[in-house]
């Protein structure tokens, strides 16, 4: 049939990524055979070709669940969040289920998240996981929102039972490498194939066909049941919609071929009643068939020898009763298919004797046939969930900024899983949050060497190189990423970091803005833009960028930190304290945020609280020199020079090449009237190439130390 041919060609082109050709053929298909199924197929072609606007226009107004899901997805791609939500939830009372199952709830969760409705989005992501425990993206979103439950709970026994139930419902056969859905579809393909060959029936059968299609034989509401079949999310077959008028149950019901009928019942007897109820049962099967995918039935015809035996070359259905004795024995073929259950083998207290004997023989010959399959199923589910538990633990800890716990979780993985790109990226990010830039560099470098085509996380890698001041490596990385994908926001973030390291903030800002053009929801790019505006002392623009980042992700603590630094530089200390507090609520283990929060407290004359915050920062990360330096600064301002000297002497051992440490020691020795040591440390500070502004200040201090001695010498003369 023309419709079948075009539909198969469209699917083949989609599988081979020939999207434009698929669109062309699907437009022909829809013009010749207008139906909701073909409309959905064309929408998929448009979406595959990044033409969400085209899918939006052709699906607008569709009411079937699958069309609503595709329309909502198109709206989401076009940033029409209100229309997307309305398509997924047409009723305010939520009486109608969200189309798409787990995917529909996940999409609705994203819509709620980007609309600023955090609690609703959390609910939808949890619903997605309840529908499909393997919907990892939903768990990842929950981690990002800070609302994820422990992985052992999410991927525990309930998830295992859910997956087992789903697999049983889908009739997965692990041992034979094919699903029982395909076997069932091949049985139903028998009826479709028989119908499609009615043109080859001899003349007398043509007359019988007219008699068979008389209105008196049509069951009530048959058309209505087939045309409004509930629209399960599987795509119905357009072939079935075309041959509705032929009414396949009636064709088989009225055939006067006893031998053939017996053979047919030997195939479908596991779910067919006796002759009196044959039409009703087949009508129900036709209704069920309308919810199945066309591609699955076609695959079943190709793979299953049963369905192949009833093609155009197999005309044995039309033989006389005597000739039909030489037809292939279908009852002998039934052993190749799985028997569903003894309940389906009998109906209304009766069973076909031939079927019953074949089922009994099958059960006797293979009494524990399902045991290996069930064991394989349970074993496979257990392995998958065990892996997801480890990954989930690490991911959850990382988003809670418990980086040490995250690293310990990832170390439980096998070597194969640990060396995957995603895990190496997570490990690198964990070290990055710990400010262990050398280990972070090692992890990111390994990931980039093994997977040079993967760009996810490269923005963080470029920031690591920025902090390590690896200008040459950062420039090489930026060029490499741009050559791989110029349309990736991560690539342009790397370029921007390269220019920022060179103090070319204007060019860096343009690079980060280019990343935002490619992905408006790329939170880190907005934050980096804010940093560059702050470096240019354009604080209003910096604040605007940080606000945009927080509009996308309220748990992006870097933006809260950036706002705090902006207010701190503007001497708005109360506002700065509030922003640092919000940042600490998200990342309570950041010694950098604690340090600057302490500075804001100190500037507000809350010195005791400031000292406590500095000590907490030192305990959190003893390797970070910043809290120790500012602790000494606060002690110096309070006149406690000896404690400040002790802190700086310890810090000097950790950071001997830091000019600011020696300059601070020079000031303290000056206050303690140990002028020789003060001059020594000021000289060391100048030798370590401080910034021009710091160099001017250090020279001014040295002049104050030398000038009194000169005056004393002149007076003696």
From Swiss-Prot:
Q: Does the keyword Cell cycle apply?
A: yes
Question: Does the record bear Repeat in its keywords?
Answer: yes
SMART domains assigned to the protein according to its UniProt record, in alphabetical order:
TPR
Q: Which InterPro entries match?
A: TPR-like_helical_dom_sf, TPR_2, TPR_rpt
The residue intervals holding the TPR repeats read 421-454, 489-522, 524-556, 557-590, 592-624, 625-658, 659-692
Q: Name one Pfam family in it.
A: ANAPC3
Q: Compositional bias of type Polar residues: which residue ranges? A: 198-208, 342-356
What's an example Gene Ontology biological process for this entry? cell division
Superkingdom of the organism of origin: Eukaryota
A Gene Ontology cellular component where this protein is annotated is:
anaphase-promoting complex
| Residues covered by region (Disordered) | 198-217, 282-315, 342-374
> Which compartments does it reside in?
Nucleus
Q: Which UniProt keywords apply?
A: Cell cycle, Cell division, Mitosis, Nucleus, Repeat, TPR repeat, Ubl conjugation pathway
Stretches of Basic residues bias are at 293-304
Q: In which pathway does it act?
A: Protein modification; protein ubiquitination
| Coarse class of the protein's main subcellular location | nucleus
What is the deletion mutant like?
A: No visible phenotype. Cdc27a and cdc27b double mutant is gametophytic lethal.
What does the record note on quaternary structure?
The APC/C is composed of at least 10 subunits. Interacts with APC2 and APC10.
What family classification does the UniProt entry report for this protein?
Belongs to the APC3/CDC27 family.
Briefly state the protein's biological role: Component of the anaphase promoting complex/cyclosome (APC/C), a cell cycle-regulated E3 ubiquitin-protein ligase complex that controls progression through mitosis and the G1 phase of the cell cycle. The APC/C complex controls several key steps in the cell cycle by mediating ubiquitination and subsequent degradation of target proteins such as cyclins. The APC/C complex is required for the female gametophyte development and is involved in several aspect of development by controlling cell division and cell elongation. Involved in the control of endoreduplication.
Task: Name the chain's protein.
Answer: Cell division cycle protein 27 homolog A
Lineage, highest ranks first: Eukaryota, Viridiplantae, Streptophyta, Embryophyta, Tracheophyta
């Amino acid at each position: 049939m023309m419709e079948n041919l075009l539909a198969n060609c469209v699917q083949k082109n989609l599988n081979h990524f020939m999207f434009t050709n698929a669109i062309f053929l699907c437009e022909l298909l829809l013009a010749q055979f207008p139906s909701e199924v073909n409309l959905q197929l064309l929408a998929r072609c448009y979406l595959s070709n990044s033409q969400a606007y085209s899918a939006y226009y052709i699906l607008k107004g569709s009411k079937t669940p699958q069309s609503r899901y595709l329309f909502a997805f198109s709206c989401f791609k076009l940033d029409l969040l209100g229309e997307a939500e309305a398509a997924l939830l047409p009723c305010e009372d939520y009486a109608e289920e969200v189309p798409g199952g787990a995917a529909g709830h996940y999409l609705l969760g994203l819509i709620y998240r980007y609309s600023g409705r955090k609690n609703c989005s959390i609910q939808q992501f949890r619903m997605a996981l309840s529908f499909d425990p393997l919907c990892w993206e939903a768990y990842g979103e929950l981690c990002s929102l800070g609302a994820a439950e422990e992985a052992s709970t999410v991927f525990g026994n309930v998830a295992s039972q859910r997956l087992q139930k789903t697999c049983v419902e889908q009739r997965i056969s692990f041992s034979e490498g094919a699903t029982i859905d395909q076997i069932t579809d091949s049985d139903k393909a028998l009826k479709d194939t028989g119908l499609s060959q009615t043109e080859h029936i001899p003349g007398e059968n043509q007359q019988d066909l007219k008699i068979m299609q008389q209105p008196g034989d049509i069951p009530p509401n048959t058309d209505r049941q087939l045309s409004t079949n509930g629209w399960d999310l599987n795509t119905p077959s357009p072939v079935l919609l075309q041959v509705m008028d032929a009414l396949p149950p009636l064709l088989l019901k009225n055939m006067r071929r006893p031998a053939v009928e017996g053979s047919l019942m030997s195939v479908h007897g596991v779910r067919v009643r006796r002759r009196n109820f044959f039409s009703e049962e087949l009508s129900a099967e036709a209704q069920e068939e309308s919810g199945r995918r066309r591609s699955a039935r076609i695959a079943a015809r190709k793979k299953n020898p049963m369905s192949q035996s009833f093609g155009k070359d197999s005309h044995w259905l039309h033989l006389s009763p005597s000739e039909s004795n030489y037809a292939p024995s279908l009852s002998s073929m039934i052993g190749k298919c799985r028997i569903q259950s003894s309940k389906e083998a009998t109906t209304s207290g009766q069973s076909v004797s031939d079927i019953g004997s074949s089922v009994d023989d099958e059960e006797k010959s293979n009494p524990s046939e399902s045991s290996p399959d069930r064991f394989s199923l349970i074993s496979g589910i257990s392995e998958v969930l065990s892996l997801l538990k480890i990954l989930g633990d690490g991911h959850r800890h990382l988003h809670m900024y418990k980086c040490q716990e995250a690293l310990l979780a990832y170390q439980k993985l096998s070597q194969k899983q640990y060396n995957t790109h995603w895990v190496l990226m997570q490990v690198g990010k964990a070290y990055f949050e710990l400010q262990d830039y050398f280990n972070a560099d090692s992890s990111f470098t390994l990931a980039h060497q093994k997977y040079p085509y993967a760009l996810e996380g490269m923005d963080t890698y470029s920031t690591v190189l920025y902090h390590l001041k690896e200008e040459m490596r950062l420039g090489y990385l930026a060029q490499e990423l741009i050559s791989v994908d110029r349309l990736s926001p991560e690539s342009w973030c790397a370029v921007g970091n390269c220019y920022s390291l060179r103090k070319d903030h204007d060019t860096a800002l343009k690079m980060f803005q280019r990343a935002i053009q490619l992905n408006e929801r790329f939170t880190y790019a907005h934050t980096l833009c804010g940093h560059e505006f702050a470096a240019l002392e354009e604080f209003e623009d910096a604040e605007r960028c940080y606000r945009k980042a927080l509009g996308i992700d309220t748990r992006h603590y870097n933006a809260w930190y950036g706002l705090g630094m902006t207010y701190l530089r503007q001497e708005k200390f109360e506002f700065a304290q509030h922003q640092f507090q919000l940042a600490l609520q998200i990342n309570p283990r950041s010694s950098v945020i604690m340090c600057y929060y302490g500075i804001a407290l100190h500037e507000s004359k809350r010195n005791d609280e400031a000292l406590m915050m500095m000590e907490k920062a030192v305990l959190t990360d003893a390797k970070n020199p910043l809290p120790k330096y500012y602790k000494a600064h606060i002690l110096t301002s309070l006149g406690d020079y000896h404690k400040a000297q002790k802190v700086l002497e310890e810090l000097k051992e950790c950071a001997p090449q830091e000019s600011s440490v020696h300059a601070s020691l020079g000031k303290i020795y000056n206050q303690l009237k140990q002028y020789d040591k003060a001059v020594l440390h000021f000289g060391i500070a100048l030798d370590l190439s401080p910034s021009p502004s710091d160099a001017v200040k250090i020279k001014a201090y040295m002049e104050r130390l030398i000038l009194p001695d000169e005056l004393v010498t002149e007076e003696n003369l």
